[in-house]
């Protein structure tokens, strides 16, 4: 049986980390693509040489031509400009929209059957635009955000409660921005919903509120510390989890930016919701029961996403 082919579009910090993880996990042969000559080739060679140490047999190739992604089973898109201190994800809109157009056209021409995971920010608008530019089925184009945001939520909860992250299930909904909605009632520690943990004295309501706010600002916290870029380890791990569920038909339920067709009362946009990822791509959306407060927060987050979509349409009239 032929090995899977994984095309990583963008050879920056996330792209290089993705290539390393994909090789170590033996997910498939890796094409690391970038427009910068030498960068993908150098990183691919470095990881290939490392494979002789960690003992995994995979092929890695750096490329500057979209023709090299031909026949890819999975494309993970990180191409674009990352955030710098003082920037919001939305500040990246104009330049990264142009990047998504080039990437979408490259995927359409050479890897039309791929499952596409977008990481480029502002995420919800970029994955929506990428799907239109590529013309791929909507269930085959998805955005990585909720897995990362939920992982941050889970880590902060583990830190506060002293419980293993393996026993924490945290969920975030909505857009990948400061208006995201950490789902407190639906997140659990050892099976106990977070409000019950507060009642039992595991953590105070003030501490929980602080964790929720830190989750919303989690990306900015890392940008401020790094000063020259944004997070890359956790985003890469998150995208690999999504790709693995697709390639191995695991049917994992993961929070991702997914195209909605009536779920949560919404149509014709991408926003973060729990979704079953299997061999068919985004196979089934899980709809949480939400109370009035959660509905209001989710609606606010969706309005932010819609605003970004309208801004994209103003820049590129081909988007509808």
Curated annotation (Swiss-Prot):
Gene3D superfamilies: Lactate dehydrogenase/glycoside hydrolase, family 4, C-terminal, NAD(P)-binding Rossmann-like Domain
Keywords: NAD, Oxidoreductase, Tricarboxylic acid cycle
Active site: 176
A single MF term (Gene Ontology): L-malate dehydrogenase (NAD+) activity
Binding positions (substrate): 83, 89, 121, 152
Protein family per UniProt: Belongs to the LDH/MDH superfamily. MDH type 3 family.
Task of the protein: Catalyzes the reversible oxidation of malate to oxaloacetate.
Annotated protein name in UniProt: Malate dehydrogenase
